[in-house]
Amino acid sequence: MTVELPSTQRALVFDTWNGPLEVRQVPVPSPADDEILVKIEYSGICHSDLHVWLGDLKDMSVCPLVGGHEGAGSVVQIGKNVTGWQLGDKAGVKLMNFNCLNCEFCKKGHEPLCHHIQNYGFDRSGTFQEYLTIRGVDAAKINKDTNLAAAAPILCAGVTVYKALKESNVAPGQIIVLTGAGGGLGSLAIQYACAMGMRVVAMDHGSKEAHCKGLGAEWFVDAFETPDIVSHITKLTEGGPHGVINFAVARKPMEQAVEYVRKRGTVVFVGLPKDSKVTFDTTPFIFNAITIKGSIVGSRLDVDEAMEFVTRGIVKVPLELVKLEDVPAVYQRMLDGKINSRAVVDFSL
């Protein structure tokens, strides 16, 4: 089986941070001996793509750049040293790749912490293009029965929330608060949390209450209209939730979480406020034996586990399919807080 390939492809490129986003023709790459070439059929649009383009993550990214890091498609070429892949297989291109597989972090399953990591859509051109090479050992295998459009966001958003839920150490039957619950990450987190047996308190703007409860949240807290968030959640959960995951990109909910989480509870930070700084009183942190930790995407195994929920239909990805040319408009809606679903580029449009 051979696949005839074009010499050029469409890609969404920016030359300077916060500069024009332009669809251009760029060369189709050839895979190295240890790589496969994936025809990208769908690419999720992540908030971090927006922040890279805006220049908020200059220390981690380069220009010019093709953004994107949630790509799903089909294998169309295979390097001579690659094993385990066949032409036509469904493959995923996730954010963090090129880890060494030999350091202490890789050996313990903490692959995203490897010092050799390279990030698609950050320091390597990413999935907002029709063809992309990736090492065979890095590409995620996607079940042939999995909806590829739904699979794309799982490669970053899905595994991010799934791993954060695992990091929260909240057990089945216990309560977890999800801030920013009505957004793209939160919408997935509600479903994963419910599937894992957790009881969910969703926190976001009041306009997103029906959306969050429709996904399985047991309670909803209006983050903008509730007079005293800390006392309200403490009372609602009879002593505080066992865990909190902060998806909101603001300082206040991060600081409040330390005050209302249950004794010996865990607060997980995922959302990045613009200035990346928070301030909180160390007294409750110490005297209540609270654990505060960060969480960033997940390992190969985490990706496989997160994808299985989607393949089995347990987690449903709220999708909005858009054209490649629509990415700038999606970024603006993200800035305006008007995204309830996962926007995904459909390259057939």
From Swiss-Prot:
Residues binding NAD(+), per UniProt: G180, A181, G182, G183, G184, L185, G186, D204, K208, V270, G271, L272, R342
Catalysed conversion reaction: a primary alcohol + NAD(+) = an aldehyde + NADH + H(+); a secondary alcohol + NAD(+) = a ketone + NADH + H(+)
Family under the similarity heading: Belongs to the zinc-containing alcohol dehydrogenase family.
CC cofactor: Zn(2+)
Binding site for Zn(2+) 1: C46, H69, C156
Assembly: Homotetramer.
Any matching Pfam family: ADH_N
UniProt protein name: Alcohol dehydrogenase 1
InterPro entries linked to this entry: ADH-like_C, ADH-like_N, ADH_Zn_CS, GroES-like_sf, NAD(P)-bd_dom_sf, PKS_ER
GO MF, one annotated term: alcohol dehydrogenase (NAD+) activity
EC supergroup of this enzyme: oxidoreductase
Organism: Caenorhabditis elegans
EC number: 1.1.1.1
Manner of cofactor binding, per the entry note: Binds 2 Zn(2+) ions per subunit.
Keywords assigned: Metal-binding, NAD, Oxidoreductase, Zinc
Residues annotated for Zn(2+) 2 binding in this entry: C100, C103, C106, C114
Entry GO CC: cytoplasm
GO BP of this protein: defense response to Gram-positive bacterium
